[in-house]
């Protein structure tokens, strides 16, 4: 189920955004790991952690998420195009739940509710990241096929 034509693959591979994504996506994953670890340690009282660090962790995770999403808008203006629709919908849902954490914190929700909301935000990130990875694998297989056929 490839989505890219040979012309689109050439454009994608030449895009600055592709390079930015290759650098920032793993950094975002490490922020996710740190955030989910802190959230879990706090939620289960494994160690004494000030709730401030839960918010800082999701803040940095959200900032990297936003940088990746915004750079996709800036470089090549590909947001919500047919080729990237599901990735962008997934990113929008994940962004909503990441930002919802801060809205709920501002509204004064208790820490236990914010911990659950942080888990939901992290879960939407994982679902979104998994669908990205599946699509990348499919596209890499398609790209190999197109190279063998001489279309690239």
PLM-predicted stretches and their roles:
Residues 5-18:
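Cytosolic juxtamembrane amphipathic/interface segments immediately preceding
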Residues 16, 49, 110-111, 142:
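General structural signal for secondary-structure boundaries
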Residues 140-152:
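Short, highly charged, low-complexity non-transmembrane loops/tails of multi-pass membrane proteins
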């Amino acid at each position: 189920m490839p989505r890219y034509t040979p012309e689109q693959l050439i454009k994608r591979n030449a895009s600055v955004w592709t390079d930015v994504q290759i650098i920032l996506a793993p950094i975002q994953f490490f922020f996710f790991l740190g955030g989910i670890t802190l959230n879990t340690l706090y939620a289960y009282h494994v160690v004494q952690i000030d709730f401030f660090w839960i918010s800082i962790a999701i803040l940095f995770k959200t900032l990297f998420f936003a940088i990746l999403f915004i750079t996709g808008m800036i470089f090549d203006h590909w947001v919500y195009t047919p080729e990237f629709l599901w990735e962008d919908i997934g990113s929008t849902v994940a962004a909503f739940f990441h930002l919802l954490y801060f809205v709920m914190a501002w509204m004064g929700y208790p820490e236990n509710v914010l911990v659950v909301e942080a888990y939901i935000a992290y879960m939407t990130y994982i679902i979104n990241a998994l669908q990205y990875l599946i699509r990348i694998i499919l596209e890499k297989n398609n790209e190999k096929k197109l190279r063998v056929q001489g279309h690239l």
